[in-house]
A protein has these predicted regions:
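Bacterial Sec-dependent N-terminal signal peptides
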Residues: 1-22
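Extracellular/periplasmic carbohydrate-active domains that bind, remodel
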Residues: 18-189
Length: 189
């Protein structure tokens, strides 16, 4: 029994990035002003951390606007209290992807902390409707959610708030294995 508890604790610490390098979002020119689109900077930070063998990208207090960001194996996202990942209200920021944070075939990653992922769903849906009316996008265009994971393994989603998705569901997990969701709160006011 002690052996199982020890192995579980070791897996939890390694997946959550507690034994890995921690990289502050501000070091990657990621702006916390709630205005600038940080999609390229956040993706660049995740790609860099993955190329270094993994670690944690840490967001401190602020509002970080982004479109779709691809998660990578070995890279965790930490949302400190007061950190809000704010989904872009421009459908083109998602490039046809299904979520603000999305991953397919990702292993050993986590999103954790007491921050918020805010999809600004009503405003995004207004933009999608306008783009459909102008025939700029098809009527069956992908409407992004907040977190989308497909065929992912050894994933922990812990303690953050999911707010205002543009879809009925804020979190999609399709297949995969050893995915833990613990202490997350859905605020769909």
């Amino acid at each position: 029994m002690k052996r199982i508890l020890l192995l579980t604790a070791l897996l939890l610490f390694s997946v959550m990035g507690l034994s890995q390098n921690v990289y502050k979002a501000s070091n990657f020119n990621i702006k916390s002003d709630g205005v600038h689109d940080n999609t390229t900077s956040i993706q660049g930070a995740i790609d860099f951390i993955a190329s270094k063998g993994g670690g944690t990208l840490e967001f401190s207090v602020g509002r970080y606007v982004t479109g779709a960001v691809q998660l990578k194996s070995g890279v965790s996202i930490r949302l400190r209290e007061g950190a809000v990942i704010v989904g872009s209200t421009n459908i083109y920021s998602y490039k046809g992807r299904k979520a603000v944070f999305w991953g397919e075939g990702v292993e050993n990653m986590s999103i954790f902390g007491t921050g918020v992922i805010d999809g600004r769903g009503p405003a995004l849906l207004d933009d999608i409707a306008a783009q459909i009316r102008m025939k700029h996008i098809p009527e069956d265009a992908v409407v992004p959610t907040l977190v989308y994971l497909k065929d992912c393994k050894n994933v922990i989603l812990k303690d953050f708030i999911l707010r205002y998705p543009a879809t009925k569901d804020d979190l999609y997990i399709i297949e995969g294995g050893n995915v833990t969701v613990d202490g997350c709160y859905s605020d769909m006011r």
